[in-house]
A protein has these predicted regions:
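Sec-dependent N-terminal signal peptides
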Residues: 4-16
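Conserved functional micro-motifs across diverse proteins
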Residues: 21-165
Length: 165
């Protein structure tokens, strides 16, 4: 767990990262969903995989996050409240095929239980204890709010880097 918190600290230093000559939002679009978690707060939830991690992170954080994302399903969470809100990060879970998987929130910036002021950027990670099957639809839940992820065959293929030659 200490390693994950060290990763989160390194992560704060590496954001935001831009790939030269490429539009990061276009690269993340297929793997991002918007979740309304409170009046005045919408969070971008990005599925972390071989396609999204290099867009969001730079070395050495990139290598650590990619390794963790290969061990268990992870999401990058970002948002900015339009007014003061109370955020409860303990309420995130994922459902797939009738099973519910709790998540562990990792704070990078303002992604912890409590008050978040208008305009404060929220950054964090959600980590599941295991991998879910990304070839099947799944839902990220926060209390009564939810958003569905359903990836195409091509998107699932893009999530895994080709083997090294």
């Amino acid at each position: 767990m200490k390693k994950i918190f060290a990763v989160a600290a390194l992560l704060a230093l590496s954001l935001p990262f831009r790939v030269a000559g490429q539009d990061p939002s276009a690269q993340l679009k297929d793997f991002t969903r918007l979740l309304q978690v409170a009046d005045g707060l919408q969070l971008s939830i990005v599925h972390l995989n071989d396609k999204t991690v290099p867009v969001l992170f730079q070395p050495p954080t990139l290598y650590s996050i990619r390794a963790h994302a290969k061990e268990a399903t992870m999401f990058y969470v970002q948002g900015m409240p339009q007014k003061d809100v109370n955020l409860d990060t303990s309420g995130f879970s994922v459902q797939q095929g009738g099973e519910s998987f709790p998540s562990t929130p990792l704070n990078i910036s303002h992604f912890e239980k409590g008050k978040v002021s208008k305009g404060d950027r929220i950054d964090g990670l959600l980590q599941l204890a295991k991998h879910i099957d990304v070839s099947k639809p799944f839902t990220v839940l926060h209390g009564k709010d939810s958003v569905e992820f359903k990836f195409s065959e091509d998107q699932v293929k893009a999530m895994t880097a080709p083997p090294a030659k």
